[in-house]
């Protein structure tokens, strides 16, 4: 129906299922928060800390995993990551203390970086004019793993006693990951003509062609470290106390030192190359991925943030029950199965830049009007606005990653890692801002940021889409 070859279809389905399973594993704790709290005698604050730990390492992991994917190929990296996910799931299911849970949820954050591996695999097997559709299906269906974990794992746990139900359910997700690791390695090879000679810079620097791009790369890296610093600050009593204030500042200083070291590495790596002529097959503009990273920080960051706060917003604004608010709030999340592939499909047919302009503008308007919603508005109007906002931004996710692989194919993994990391950075920043402002102001802040991203799109250069022979 979509014009994919048999090999392309097999690759797509094997890869989105691999991504789906990493998300099931990544979110396998959420359905059992209350159960774990009661069984192990944890406080609500400790559960909240574990939820934060679940995403702390995802930001750097996406860049590191993207780099490894460019270097070693997606087949090996995804298979290895699935094995790692399985091992962490099993050790998590055996944990008997807060410390054991803490270490395992930190490690599970690495699994959340698996998204970028599939972006590279799809980019290698699909032509440019079908890239958006394929990437949208991969990401849209794979992301559904988070929702699948929420409604399926409790059903598995119900088959066993309360004491061991959650442990068996979470260990089962690990077993699935391990089985799929072998299936993926056996049946989903890299393309035969992978280029092994493109410099991928394992230390994390992008190969750029000008000092302007080198300066821009240095600027773009800071928010990633900044988000990690913000995590540490939140764990020192703002609002959770896991570490002392002095230790938090020491860790922040250490992160800043690593950031400076990374910048020095970038300059050492690139300065000798800038003076040399750039082959046509390696030429690209770093501003392209910088702008798309801003887009994804908006579309994906907003998605995660609004999913987290929207049920509470409905409950307090319209005085409805917790159950009804949760059910209505889920409407924002479930559009991903259709909207993200739809955004990629539209990009394939009407162009990447044009599609992004329309989707960002639509999300801007929707969230601005959400900021006007109060108890005097009909509940149905708020739901409709949220659905429109969800569709525009989730389709924006698909349109964004329809464009990322077109910048420089040999660096798709690393570029997907950077854009993906920015998505998590956006979520961290939005949720932090939410703790300081009203829900109405929060939605307007999203709209204001969308306006800035909309302006940045004017600097996005057209993408060259090549058709297959």
Residue ranges and their predicted role:
Residues 71-82, 348-361:
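Cytoplasmic membrane-interface "Motif A"-like loop-to-helix N-cap segments
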Residues 104-141:
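Cytoplasmic helix-loop-helix junction between adjacent transmembrane helices
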Residues 29-30, 221-249, 253, 287-330:
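Extracytoplasmic gate region of multi-pass secondary transporters
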Residues 99-107, 380-389:
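Paired small-residue
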């Amino acid at each position: 129906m979509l014009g994919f070859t048999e090999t392309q279809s097999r690759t797509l389905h094997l890869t989105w299922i691999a991504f789906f399973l990493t998300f099931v594993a990544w979110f396998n704790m959420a359905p059992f928060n209350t159960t774990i709290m009661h069984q192990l005698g944890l406080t609500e604050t400790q559960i909240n800390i574990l939820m934060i730990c679940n995403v702390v390492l995802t930001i750097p992991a996406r860049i590191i995993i993207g780099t490894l994917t460019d270097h070693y190929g997606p087949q090996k990296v995804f298979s290895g990551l699935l094995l790692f996910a399985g091992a962490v799931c099993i050790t998590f299911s055996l944990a008997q203390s807060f410390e054991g849970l803490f270490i395992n949820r930190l490690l599970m954050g690495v699994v959340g970086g698996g998204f970028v591996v599939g972006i590279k695999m799809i980019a290698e097997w699909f032509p440019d004019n079908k890239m958006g559709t394929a990437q949208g299906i991969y990401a849209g269906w794979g992301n559904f793993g988070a929702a699948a974990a929420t409604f399926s794992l409790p059903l598995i746990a119900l088959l066993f006693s309360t004491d061991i139900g959650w442990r068996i359910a979470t260990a089962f997700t690990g077993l699935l990951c391990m089985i799929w690791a072998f299936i993926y390695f056996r049946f989903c090879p890299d393309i035969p003509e992978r280029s092994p000679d493109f410099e991928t810079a394992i230390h994390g620097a992008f190969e750029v062609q000008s000092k302007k791009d080198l300066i821009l790369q240095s600027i773009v890296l800071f928010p990633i470290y900044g988000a990690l610093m913000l995590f540490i600050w939140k764990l020192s009593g703002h609002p959770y106390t896991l570490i002392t204030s002095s230790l938090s500042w020491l860790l922040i200083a250490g992160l800043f030192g690593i950031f400076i070291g990374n910048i020095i590495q970038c300059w050492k790596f690139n300065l000798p190359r800038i003076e040399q002529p750039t082959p046509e097959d390696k030429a690209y503009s770093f501003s392209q991925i910088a702008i798309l990273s801003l887009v994804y920080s908006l579309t994906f960051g907003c998605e995660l943030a609004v999913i987290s706060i929207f049920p509470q917003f409905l409950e307090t604004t319209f005085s409805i029950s917790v159950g009804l608010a949760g059910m209505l709030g889920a409407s924002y999340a479930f559009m991903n199965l259709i909207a993200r592939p739809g955004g990629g499909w539209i990009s394939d047919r009407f162009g990447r830049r044009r599609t992004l302009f329309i989707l960002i503008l639509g999300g801007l308007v929707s969230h601005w009007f959400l900021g006007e919603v109060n108890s005097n508005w009909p509940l149905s109007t708020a739901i409709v606005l949220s659905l429109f906002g969800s569709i525009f931004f989730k389709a924006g996710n698909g349109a964004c990653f329809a464009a990322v692989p077109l910048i420089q194919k040999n660096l798709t993994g690393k570029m997907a890692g950077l854009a993906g990391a920015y998505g998590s950075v956006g979520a961290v920043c939005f949720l932090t801002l939410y703790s300081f402002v009203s829900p109405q102001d929060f939605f307007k802040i999203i709209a204001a940021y969308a306006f800035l991203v909309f302006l940045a799109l004017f600097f996005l250069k057209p993408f060259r889409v090549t058709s297959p022979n």
